Amino acid sequence: MINLSQKNVVQVANLTGFIKDNVEKVMRLADILEFICSTQWKDKLVLKGGTAINLFYRQLPRLSVDIDLDYIGQSKEEMGEDKERLWEFLQTSLYQKNYSLSPKRKRYFALDSAVFQYVNNAGNRDNIKIEINYLDRNHILPIKEMPLATPVVQSDITINVLDVCELYGSKLAALLGRCKPRDIYDVYGLEKDNIVSDMDMLRKCAIFYNCIAGEANINEVSSDILDGVTERDINRQLKPVLKKSEKFNRSEVISELKEYLKELFALTEKEKLFVEKFNAKQYCPELLFEDEQILSRIAHHPMALWRMR
């Protein structure tokens, strides 16, 4: 169980150099994840996004602000049965942990998004957003089961997490689609620390997630999109989750990332054809991947098939 006491939060904040209220938020994120993974829902959910990257693969260079999960039950029928049960489970369990469900919640066939409010140790109101995607339930690479061990929080309970290559592939797709400051920071960490060695697989994962997201055509997108992130965006959306001592040079980072993206996204002819056919409502994963196990896993990917409608 995560120690959420004010004394522990202050101590960890002082040791790590992060803002105290945001340290408490990360501890609460971890506490919720730990609780979920101590129940029958552990085998039905996998963690993804920036929280997965920073809690499990990068020793928390920045703090996380939400929980992004994929449901991984296989059949549509199983998903339909589990969706309402999981929603009720989250509401009931977090209410018992003194969280209240915000009216900002959104419920769709493909996604449940809930904002849970709480009062922190300093007496300030804050919230944690939890999103569960039900159409990304098939994955390119095998899911990892990993322990939580960071400078801010540790747990003996293991958590299902996407493979690092797939995580960063989806993060790259997010960068090209929405280009938020935290996406820039996470991808810069990928490039700077050489976290993924298989660049071909990384590119293919990014292409796949870009296509199923439907946000921007990777054959046409320009790295100039990074220029749209301003110093004001960095100050408001990124710096509060960094260590107080960390410096972030926007122009230098964007310049390096542009070169990295240019090299990474030199698509092969087959990769270009996959994108063209996907945009023409033809799903041909064999143009992107050759591995039979990967093709078997994503042959009936619900989101990819939904995009074909």
What are these model-predicted stretches?
Residues 1-45, 55-67, 71-309:
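Structured mid-to-C-terminal alpha-helical surface segments
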Residues 47-51:
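Glycine-rich beta-strand-to-loop/alpha-helix junction loops that act as flexible
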